[in-house]
Amino acid sequence: EIFINGRKMRSPSELEQLSSDNIKSVEVVHTPGARYDAEVKAVVRILTKKPQGEGFGFNNITSTNYQWEWSFNEQFDFNYRKGGFDLGGTLFGASSKGTQKKTLIQHSYLENHWKQDSYCDIKYLTRNMTAMLSANYMLNANHSFGVRYQFDRTPKADFGFPMATEVTKDDASFETSEMTSMQKRQSTGHELNLYYNGKVKDWTIDFNADGMWGYTHQNDWADESIQSIEGDEKVTVTSHSRKENSLYAAKLILSHLLAG
């Protein structure tokens, strides 16, 4: 995990916006201890200098790639700084569309030789967007506080899984099947963080409060037709789910250097 001025880094873009000239110190902790989650193996703590420059800056990144279909990404970052006040934000949008073709051949040698050939042509279309706004104020070298809010939205995540399968027994046709399944998903998420990092005499104060809430809405549909020497069968399965989640937590750490 990486912490910048006592606040946990939530996006790689936060690190990209840091200039080496603005970094006061970097501390790597290989044994984080009880103040961090048990699964955290190492912690990087970055302290920045009090901002000197003022003004507005921005960065825009556009990327595209092709894998049977075209996909696009667009990201805009901005930053405004005046005195010890720093305002930053990110707008991100992506549209991904693609195809994955797969072939699976399986042989089983039991009393008879069974062979299963499966052909799958997966298609997907996803669209998602992110908006982030953060405000930080560095009062002096010993006191800084701020707030960060992020909104994530996936209005469309559609997946199609058509698959055709043929089963043979000793090279004679035994069963054929065709299955078509679809999944449609939408999700919305919110993240809010408040932090304060300071030092009063010999005491170090580290406070963080986090809130995360959102939902996922998903529909699944599958239709399978089987033709076999033992008889034909057709099965249709549909399902709908909506999951809501929320988490709120706060942490206050007071540290004092022992004498000696």
Q: Which residue ranges define each predicted feature?
A:
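Short acidic/polar hinge/loop motifs at secondary-structure boundaries
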Residues: 7-33
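N-terminal periplasmic accessory domains that precede
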Residues: 12-13, 28, 38-61, 74
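Outer-membrane beta-barrel translocator domains and adjoining extracellular loop/strand segments
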Residues: 100-112, 158-174, 218-231
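Face-selective signature of the C-terminal outer-membrane beta-barrel domain
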Residues: 130-154, 180-260
